[in-house]
């Protein structure tokens, strides 16, 4: 497409593309935006190397004149986006690109891959955090991840979603994340007995004393052997503040309760009981409902692969272009009504209740529109007009959600560190009422188009429809 536009003389036409999605993953009530830092690095460094150009030439698809043009191609436009950790909803503009058309097309695939994947994992992680409460959450997914990049960036996304650390050492090094983990069954099987394996581990890692208790028999051997080690270390004055076991199989609710009883009777009521074994938010919720005594969770496969919703349907659509210096809104029509796009240069205004700090609604606007917080605000529903309601002036505040990231090809955004992103993500979740956080049948956030945007959409739809009727 880029080459075709080049020879048609349209490659440098200024245009606007929006990135958004249509449906929340996991049948949930929200999506956590992630991947912006990864995207920034990609955009900032995008270029064609000599090897890239040589390969493109070898395919036989590309002409020399176009390949010569690609040598100096860099991103020269503007990007606006919601910051990482932002809670978002269907149809909202998550990211807006204003640039030459060939540059936008060059960004589309990688941009979609990065933000679809990382937002998906961050959202899954946040659902796990919601049910885990204040428990420790460890990301254990690398061995089941669909590739190195998915494992590394998935681990970072899990942190944005609320996890405490990862077993992925590369991710820890790359992003400054806490590296957490325990032993494997192979460690225990490498020694003459489980007790000797535990003793050896305690010698080597006295401050990381989480012993894997289910290699042979959890309650008859694993837990008693762990208690023996704890007693030996206590007598020697070397028992760390944090110590305990991990369960990786069996009835986790029953085993954790029985193990806890044994620890209490032995004088170790504070022993940590960690659990793993194909966990996700649904299973953790069930285990807690059954009274499990688990306060640390290793979540791997179902998180890193987003098993029950393995893709986020984010799209990147042309919403306007400049023809002879005049901005012309564009719309994608479809036989599926939900796939009809919103034309024009847009932003999102978020409405918060001043008293509670909770989110009340999002309004998709045309860029330049504003809301007077002192005046009553009418929320109108296209689907259910009888649900329309008014928010009294003075009781709400408004926040514009898209902020500048690149301007004229230059990075103008000060990238926050991961801890800052995590704190912001936590704050965002706190603005949602619990009804929006439910795992099953969550409340749907109120999202509407502004009156001006609705009018523009209707106008462009009518103009485009005239070609067919």
Where are these regions (language model features)?
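Ordered alpha/beta subdomains of enzyme catalytic regions
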Residues: 1-207, 234-235, 317-469
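Glycine-rich phosphate/ribose-binding loops and adjacent secondary-structure elements
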Residues: 186-364
